Amino acid sequence: AKATVISIEIEDGGKKKIVISDNGQGIEKDDLNNAFMPHATSKISKVEDLDTIHTLGFRGEALASIASVCHIYASSKTENDEVGHSIRIDGGLFSEVNEVARNKGTTIEASDLFYNAPVRAKFLRRSKIEESEITHLVEKFMLAHPEISFLYVVDGKQIYNTISSELSD
């Protein structure tokens, strides 16, 4: 939340690796584990909140689903934390939360997609097609959020590096 810079890196159409980093508020140490639990969300505390949500991912399903079929490394640091914290999740199995040196914000790395679900892996399209779909999604986010700087890297090659601007600029 409240990020001004977002970095997205993918390898092999996202099948080998996807890394997303931001300089936002970060995730509290105690919430780092919870972020990957099914139905975990910080966006709903009462029924009325359902009518006022204007963001993606409020149901708490995405991270838990992804963590069940790949290797996850997540690290985060809030402004109030002296050090950051990290966790590894392998196919839904959680490690302990550890301390890590990092700047404020969050990084989530997902690697080896469907390593433990080969039947699901067969439904992935060719890497170039998956890459194209991800690129199209990143472009939509860049256009929808000019106030955020985006870095987008595909297989080690920088594709986009935008500079944030206000709509009035």
Where on the chain are the PLM-derived regions?
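N-terminal phosphate-binding caps/lids of nucleotide- and nucleic-acid-binding domains
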Residues: 1-169
